[in-house]
Amino acid sequence: AYQEIHRLKERLVDENLALTEQLNNVDSEFGEIIGRSDAMYSVLKQVEMVAQSDSTVLILGETGTGKELIARAIHNLSNRNSRRMVKMNCAAMPAGLLESDLFGHERGAFTGASSQRLGRFELADKSSLFLDEVGDMPLELQPKLLRVLQEQEFERLGSNKLIQTDVRLI
């Protein structure tokens, strides 16, 4: 009985090492994503596929389902991973400040704008910009967002100078 227990223990140790190695291989590619179901493997395959393109990506899901983790995995597997991914929660920002935060502003563009400020699109140049809760963005900002997506250019608040940007929007 003792030999059988010892043999089973050794088998469990070997199996544990193999599974740990398998998890580490997945973790190195996908960071903090821990789901191991068939559905999750399907999602991760899609992440690998879309990461190699520069396409804009829309991630849908309920609060707490890991949209930011998927966005980070897409960024980390992309050619843009040498630069930090910029994040912004559109629902947490008051509507009046959202435009300034996204596109930046010039000194004097509005009361309290005492200096020039770079927006998230400039900060994310040659990288990825993750807009969490993008559906909460005010309708009046959507044409400006569309211009960035289509033309890769925008203007800071208080300026008419076009700024070129190379951003992948997630």
Residue ranges of predicted features:
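N-terminal accessory segments that target, anchor, or regulate ATP-driven/P-loop NTPase machines
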Residues: 1-21, 61
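AAA+ ATPase active-site-proximal loops
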Residues: 20-170
